[in-house]
């Protein structure tokens, strides 16, 4: 999914559908394939992220002078951060392409969303190269970081990218020279691209990402959304029980008794 072709295929492929009461039973192989992919359960974090992204994208259209506000999705490993990110990205992609379809006969597809992974040991040049790879921007061996960045900003703006999602952001360490340069690159991109940025990473508040001058710049523009343990009760709602109920309703098991999970 870290290329436009891969992302487009993901976003436009129908997600797994839970079994319907009037549908014929699925085969064992079909049920195994379904549970392997499974449905996305709409957790409180996903609900919050969807609402916040929609709001920031609307606000960002009217902000021209400085970097737009951003979001950071944080939490422990395997807490659903990437799942939340991909769910929101797909929703944004589908909503935008419905409202703004490519003109008939156009060779240029609408590109509303970009998804980039921070590579291990990322430098500013390797990260901006990942941005270039997403849209298949030609990169010559002798191109400098500045030249690649200029090409990325020009192409992303021309393609109409509105949402940039950067995953594995915890891999950045602004206390190191390379980490500081990479953080500066991200700041530069947020100021030059007319897009909303959403980051995801493991427990980012416990990392150097939020400390020091560069960390303060990033944190100062970002709203934190935590993917953590679900509370048993929140006001009049029961988030943990609600999620378990949604999971159970989505199961396709032949001998499972509803209500026992």
Model regions and ranges:
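A short, basic N-terminal segment
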Residues: 1-69
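Conserved lysine of the Walker
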Residues: 81
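The catalytic "switch" region of P-loop NTPases
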Residues: 171-175, 185-260
């Amino acid at each position: 999914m870290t290329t436009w072709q891969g992302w487009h295929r993901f976003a436009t492929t129908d997600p797994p559908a839970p079994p319907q009461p009037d549908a014929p039973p699925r085969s064992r192989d079909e049920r195994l394939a379904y549970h392997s992919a499974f449905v996305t359960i709409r957790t409180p974090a996903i609900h919050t992220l969807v609402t916040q992204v929609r709001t920031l994208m609307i606000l960002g259209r009217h902000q021209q002078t400085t970097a737009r506000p951003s979001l950071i999705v944080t939490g422990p490993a395997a807490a659903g951060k990437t799942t939340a990110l991909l769910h929101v990205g797909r929703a944004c992609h589908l909503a935008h392409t419905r409202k703004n379809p490519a003109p008939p006969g156009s060779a240029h597809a609408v590109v509303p969303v970009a998804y980039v992974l921070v590579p291990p040991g990322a430098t500013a040049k390797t990260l901006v190269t990942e941005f270039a790879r997403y849209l298949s921007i030609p990169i010559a061996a002798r191109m400098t970081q500045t030249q690649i960045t200029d090409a990325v900003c020009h192409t992303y703006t021309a393609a109409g990218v509105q949402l940039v999602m950067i995953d594995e952001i915890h891999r950045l360490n602004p206390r190191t020279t390379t980490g500081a340069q990479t953080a500066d690159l991200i700041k530069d991109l947020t100021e030059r691209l007319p897009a909303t940025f959403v980051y995801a990473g493991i427990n980012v508040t416990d990392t150097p990402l939020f400390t020091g001058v560069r960390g303060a710049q990033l944190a100062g523009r970002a709203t934190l959304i935590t993917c953590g343990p679900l509370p048993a009760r929140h006001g009049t709602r029961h988030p943990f029980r609600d999620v378990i109920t949604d999971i159970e309703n989505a199961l396709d098991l032949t001998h499972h008794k509803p209500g026992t999970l």
